[in-house]
Amino acid sequence: MKNPNHPSVDQSDRVVPYNLRQSGRTPTELLISTRVRKSPFWHLSHEAGCWRATVYNRIYHPRGYVRPEDGGAMVEYEALVNRVTMWNVAVERQIRVKGPDAEAFTDYVITRDATKIEPGNGKYAILCNDKGGILNDPVLLRLTEDEFWFSISDSDLLLWMQGVNISKKYDVEIDEIDVCPLQIQGPLSEDLMAKLAGEELRDVPYYGLMETSIGGADVVISQTGFTGEKGYEIYVRDAHENAEIIWNAVLEAGKEFGLMVIAPAHHRRIQAGILSCLLYTSPSPRDVEE
């Protein structure tokens, strides 16, 4: 007898048990609770038209602004590849490693050589468990000799990193800080960011950092993104106080460039060959091997 979970090549007779179905709508109403965090940009995303969201890093994550009847995700895509867009990516929680042994600890937990990352620069980083499984793939920012920020993807990296140093072998503080990023992505992003941060912004290299202020609020800017387009991230310090200042400043400056607030553009990410951690990776090397 043919197993119903072993379909034919064309998948036309595929049957997936209910307990394995990860896609599709949930036929229940989900309750809002303090177990899932609302970011400092959450209400601003709603004002911008956010109509659907998911949960990422235990934070509500906007995933759509243009409704299907108005063109949906392809309208957002058009704005991204032709003009400039702003994304609420506060779900990229910021884990700070600071102290005399910050470089040594960071070098221990990532797979690349942290000693080669100069202050004022960032790198894409991978963190693995003792079996070689991928735990997280943050953008790693080195602000100073003794301070690194891990801009993390979706996993409890803070607890893992604190656990790695439970013996206090490394003289560092490991904590989550009140910093939330926005992404500014698209071919006109450099012009918009130069208007906000000054012409020196144009000298920031790929994965380079710039510390400045916008509207009186302190920020760190990196030339990074999730699209393959030219783009930047604005890391807002003291985000719960300064989120509206930065958001509104970007909206105002962006009018000239046709700025649109959109959701993270996975269609463009796929075109660019950029992986999304835990969609294509796993803490279990066996999952990747199979």
Predicted regions and their residues:
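Glycine/proline-enriched, intrinsically flexible loops and inter-domain linkers
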Residues: 2-282, 286
